[in-house]
Amino acid sequence: LDDFVPANHPLRPIKQMVNAALLKMDALLGRMYAADIKGGRPSIAPEKLIRAMLLQVFYSVRSERQLMEQTQYNLLFRWFIGLSMDDSVWVASVFSKNRERLIEHDTVIELFNLIVQQADEQQLLSGEHFSVDGSLIQAWAGHKSFVRKDRKDDQDADGSDGESKSGNDSDNSEAGNFKGQKRSNETHASTTDADARLYRKGKTASELRFMGHTLTDNRHGLVVNARVTQADGYAEREAAKAMINDARQAHEDPDVSITLGADKGYDAKEFIETLQAMNVRPHVAQNTSGRRSAVPDEI
């Protein structure tokens, strides 16, 4: 299959980086699958699962089922995952069965950290100049699942799964007709994803969402830290403080001032003061729309 992949294809260096990281994770992956080695049912190699999950992200494949369908005929996918032309693809349920195991052992976090370590070893990171940003992530839950918490508690008590007897959410009057109702995260929760929060930002409509946050090293624009939080008005700044604190702790010289760039949504007094206390210079855009900016003018 290697002959079918162009020499300059962008997946080639990515596969090299991923394989180098996976090689260092051999002991971790061995512990994860020790039960299978001792006589349990053989599992799909975790290295192949991880590479397949990366393809799903790179190519925005909506589901594991679609990913496996495409892998069946896509030679590039087979090459990246490590499948030959004759190998059978596995069923999509394999991802569900193994995802908890990957999460339990922080496998993806370890892979990410090892990739960042490679970038550092190649002197691609400054370690001193960063930017932070957040974005909304739509939850896999709809408005119809967002019902009153007391109603959800009643359903849990009587053993109901929250669906109508016909299995159609539209039969539920509250779930199907929510226009004009006052709904908030204090009084309502999603029966599909209890961690999702009803949230809107700017001119966007209110949706059940999470928030994703990234910390980028400015030298080459590489993401060096990332996390997902519940969606609220404080999440961006709280996540930024945690991530830049990690960067601060990782720097060899605590006296060296590092910088953090951010948009005007991060212009809040408590956030700016926290950065300054960490010896982090806040390169934050000033928000002067009907208010006084917390960012000092000299910055």
Task: Kindly label every feature range from the protein language model.
Residues 1-2, 151:
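Short, flexible loop/hinge motifs at secondary-structure junctions
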Residues 4, 12-124, 139:
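Basic, low-complexity intrinsically disordered segments
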Residues 9:
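ER/Golgi luminal nucleotide-sugar-dependent glycosyltransferases, focusing on the catalytic module
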Residues 33, 289-290:
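Short linear loop/turn motifs
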Residues 72, 81-280, 285-287:
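Polybasic low-complexity intrinsically disordered regions
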Residues 279, 298-299:
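C-terminal structured "cap/appendage" subdomains that terminate the fold
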Residues 291-298:
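Short, charged, surface-exposed secondary-structure boundary motifs
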